[in-house]
C-alpha cells in the first residue's frame, strides 16, 4: 500500500488497478 496525494488519486487508482489488477 502506498501513501499518495489526493491530487494523484485518479492516477493512483489506475496504478493500483494496473499493479493489483483489481480492476
From Swiss-Prot:
EC number from the UniProt entry: 2.4.2.3
Signal peptide: none
Keywords for this protein: Glycosyltransferase, Transferase
Catalytic activity: uridine + phosphate = alpha-D-ribose 1-phosphate + uracil
Source superkingdom: Bacteria
GO biological process, one term: UMP salvage
Keyword Magnesium: no
GO terms for MF: uridine phosphorylase activity
EC top class named in words: transferase
Pathway(s) the chain acts in: Pyrimidine metabolism; UMP biosynthesis via salvage pathway; uracil from uridine (phosphorylase route): step 1/1
Similarity-based family: Belongs to the PNP/UDP phosphorylase family.
Function: The enzymes which catalyze the reversible phosphorolysis of pyrimidine nucleosides are involved in the degradation of these compounds and in their utilization as carbon and energy sources, or in the rescue of pyrimidine bases for nucleotide synthesis.
Subunit structure: Homotetramer.
Name of this protein: Uridine phosphorylase
UniProt organism field: Lacticaseibacillus rhamnosus
Amino acid at each position: 500500500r502506498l501513501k499518495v496525494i489526493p491530487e494523484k488519486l485518479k492516477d493512483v487508482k489506475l496504478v493500483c488497478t494496473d499493479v493489483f489488477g483489481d480492476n
